[in-house]
C-alpha cells in the first residue's frame, strides 16, 4: 500500500480531503502532515492557487520523503475584484480566523444587490513525488454570497456561500458532508487528481 502525506494542518480540511480521497476506493494510506513531520509550514508566496498548492506539496515531499498532496483553496467574489482569492485564509489580518473572515465578507458585501453577489470557491490540488513528478488539477464551485451566516457544517466561508449546483437553497455549511463532497470545488479537484496519482504510483 502506498502512503501519501496530506500537506495540511487544518484539521477540518484534512478530514474532508481524507474522506474524499479514501472514498475513491484506492489502495493508498493517507497520513496527516503532523503525523510524520514537525516542520513549519512554508511561506505561501505564490500568485495563484496552483503555485501555492505546489509550494506546500513540494515542502511536504521534501521534509517527509513521501509523495505529498496539497490543496490551496479560496473564495473569489466578482464584485470585490475576485477578492479574497489566494488570501482567503488570511484576509482579515495576521490573526485571521473563520469568524473574523466571515465578518469582513459581510462588511464588504452587505450593500451589494442580488445580481452582484456571484462568486466561486476555487481549489487547486497538487501532487508531488520526491522522484520529481508533479500533477495539478483545478476545480471551482460557482454560487452566490448571502447576507448572513447559515449552518454549522464546513468551515471558512461556507456559511455565507450558496452553491448553484443544487436543487435547493442551502449554504455549504448547511449541507451534509456527502452532498457537499459531491459538488464542492475540493471534492471535484480530488476526484480529478486521484486517477493520475494512482496511475503514477502503480507505474513506479
UniProtKB/Swiss-Prot annotation:
SUPFAM superfamilies for the chain: ITPase-like
Record keywords: Hydrolase, Magnesium, Metal-binding, Nucleotide metabolism, Nucleotide-binding
Alphabetical list of NCBIfam families matching this protein: RdgB/HAM1 family non-canonical purine NTP pyrophosphatase (TIGR00042)
EC number: 3.6.1.66
Entry annotated with the keyword Membrane: no
Subunit structure as annotated in this protein's UniProt entry: Homodimer.
Described function: Pyrophosphatase that catalyzes the hydrolysis of nucleoside triphosphates to their monophosphate derivatives, with a high preference for the non-canonical purine nucleotides XTP (xanthosine triphosphate), dITP (deoxyinosine triphosphate) and ITP. Seems to function as a house-cleaning enzyme that removes non-canonical purine nucleotides from the nucleotide pool, thus preventing their incorporation into DNA/RNA and avoiding chromosomal lesions.
Catalysed transformations (reactions): XTP + H2O = XMP + diphosphate + H(+); dITP + H2O = dIMP + diphosphate + H(+); ITP + H2O = IMP + diphosphate + H(+)
Co-factor requirement: Mg(2+)
Swiss-Prot/TrEMBL GO biological process terms: nucleotide metabolic process; purine nucleoside triphosphate catabolic process
DNA-binding as UniProt keyword: no
GO molecular function: dITP diphosphatase activity; ITP diphosphatase activity; metal ion binding; nucleotide binding; ribonucleoside triphosphate phosphatase activity; XTP diphosphatase activity
Family designation: Belongs to the HAM1 NTPase family.
Pfam families in the record: Ham1p_like
Protein name in the entry: dITP/XTP pyrophosphatase
Disulfide partners: none
Cofactor binding comment, as recorded: Binds 1 Mg(2+) ion per subunit.
Lineage, broadest ranks: Bacteria, Bacillati, Actinomycetota, Actinomycetes, Propionibacteriales
Residues given in the record as Mg(2+) binding sites: 43, 72
Catalytic-site annotation from UniProt: 72
Residue positions binding substrate: 8-13, 73, 155-158, 180, 185-186
Origin: domain of life: Bacteria
GO cellular component terms attached to this protein's record: cytosol
Amino acid at each position: 500500500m502506498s502512503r501519501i502525506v496530506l500537506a495540511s494542518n487544518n484539521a477540518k480540511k484534512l478530514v474532508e480531503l481524507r474522506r474524499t480521497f479514501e472514498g475513491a476506493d484506492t489502495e493508498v494510506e493517507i497520513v496527516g502532515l503532523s503525523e510524520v513531520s514537525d516542520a513549519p509550514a512554508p511561506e505561501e508566496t505564490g500568485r495563484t492557487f496552483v503555485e501555492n498548492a505546489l509550494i506546500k506539496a513540494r515542502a511536504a515531499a521534501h521534509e517527509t520523503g513521501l509523495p505529498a498532496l496539497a490543496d490551496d483553496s479560496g473564495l473569489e467574489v466578482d464584485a470585490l475584484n475576485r477578492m479574497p482569492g489566494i488570501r482567503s485564509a488570511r484576509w482579515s489580518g495576521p490573526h485571521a480566523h473563520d469568524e473574523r473572515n466571515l465578518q469582513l465578507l459581510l462588511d464588504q458585501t452587505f450593500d451589494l444587490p442580488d445580481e452582484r453577489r456571484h462568486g466561486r470557491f476555487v481549489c487547486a490540488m497538487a501532487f508531488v513525488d520526491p522522484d520529481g513528478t508533479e500533477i495539478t488539477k483545478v476545480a471551482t464551485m460557482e454560487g452566490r454570497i448571502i447576507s448572513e451566516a447559515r449552518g454549522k457544517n464546513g468551515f471558512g466561508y461556507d456559511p455565507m456561500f450558496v452553491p448553484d449546483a443544487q436543487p435547493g437553497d442551502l449554504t455549504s455549511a448547511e449541507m451534509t458532508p456527502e452532498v457537499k463532497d459531491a459538488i464542492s470545488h475540493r471534492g471535484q479537484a480530488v476526484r480529478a487528481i486521484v486517477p493520475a496519482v494512482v496511475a503514477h504510483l502503480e507505474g513506479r
